[in-house]
Amino acid sequence: MEKITVPFITGDGVGAEVTPSMQAVVNAAVKKSYGDRRGIEWKEVLAGERAFHETGSWLPDETMEAFCTYKVGIKGPLTTPVGRGIRSLNVALRQTLDLYVCQRPVRWYKGIVSPLKEPQKVDMYVFRENTEDIYAGIEWEAGTPEAEKFYRFLHDDMGVTKVRFPETSSFGVKPVSREGTERLVRAACQYALEHHMPSVTLVHKGNIMKFTEGGFKKWGYELAEREFGKELAEGRLVIKDCIADAFLQNTLLIPEEYSVIATLNLNGDYVSDQLAAMVGGIGIAPGANINYKTGHAIFEATHGTAPNIAGKDIVNPCSIILSAVMMLEYLGWKEAASLIENALEQSFTEARATADLARFMPGGVSLSTSAFTREIVRRIENGNNE
């Protein structure tokens, strides 16, 4: 029997509901697809509020060791206290394991009500750089000695005179490297070719930030031409670019013009969430953080902890379920992945979903988290025939 160990973080808030839902669905799909030939052994590891209460650490060393050892894992949403000097746990996981690609597939499922007239035209795969840009977390608060020292360096050593209110300014640094750009664009181009997607679009603000965002555009084109010149010449791949604000408009007007998107960290955050809204919202938006060189990957719910609805059995578990679909595909277990997607789409088509989705569906039937989970498991076990 092929059995793999998958470390998982239940997560904070609604994580206690969506993560067990995902596991039940995945277990059913693996059992239906492979019988006793394959299986998953789930290994719980801690992070977030529960980890802090039980161990005194928000991100214990044992958790990082598990993800390092087993390489592929999955996590629910995590809390990071705002303004208390505690680094984002999601960012810490990505940077510690150097998970330089944040992948966000965006597609429409039949039955989901979309604000677009033709949501079926949306079929994109976002490759968001995950370790650099503003999200590198290099910043200093206004009024601190560090902020003053940084300003003095800018002013005295670098001749910068454009800071309008230096005494009350906080400062942040936006690192963008050639190496970081190249490995992201390389992964995007390889994905496009392997999945027969026609183009890679570099989304940037190089018109304003000429050396960071502009460097991303320049280095991205150079990498594509150097390593994928044959495919470009043969027409098997098109590399193009778009200013970020124009891209956000174009995705609403001509979404069919785009397939694989490569972009920096901050733009990628905005782009991913807008695209998710176009096909039903972040509640059904999956995500993954991957290092293609080492094979390490953490799949995750893309929404927050939603403490206001935690414990009420109403949260939509589809984000982490679809992230598990991505995980199964990454492992090469495509039969199980397809079973889950088909079961979800069939349920949506019949207007049976959690309340956040069902309320927009004509004749929609609102199901609790647990009832929706049972619904999907039943459809999987019955081969999606009923």
Residue ranges and their predicted role:
Residues 51-157, 170-171, 266-270:
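N-terminal glycine-rich phosphate/adenylate-binding segment common to multiple enzyme folds
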Residues 35-41, 195-204, 228-241, 333-341, ...:
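Flexible, glycine/charged-enriched surface loops at secondary-structure junctions
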Residues 7-24, 33, 149, 153-242:
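Glycine-rich phosphate/diphosphate-binding loop of Rossmann-like nucleotide-binding domains
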Residues 34-60:
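N-terminal beta-loop-helix "entrance" segment that forms/cooperates
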Residues 64-81, 223, 227-296, 380:
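Glycine-rich phosphate-binding loop
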Residues 365-386:
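Phosphate-binding loop/pocket of nucleotide- and phosphate-handling active sites
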Residues 49-52, 250-352:
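Glycine-rich phosphate/nucleotide-binding loop
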Residues 12-15, 71, 127, 188, ...:
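Buried hydrophobic positions in well-ordered alpha/beta secondary-structure cores of metabolic enzymes
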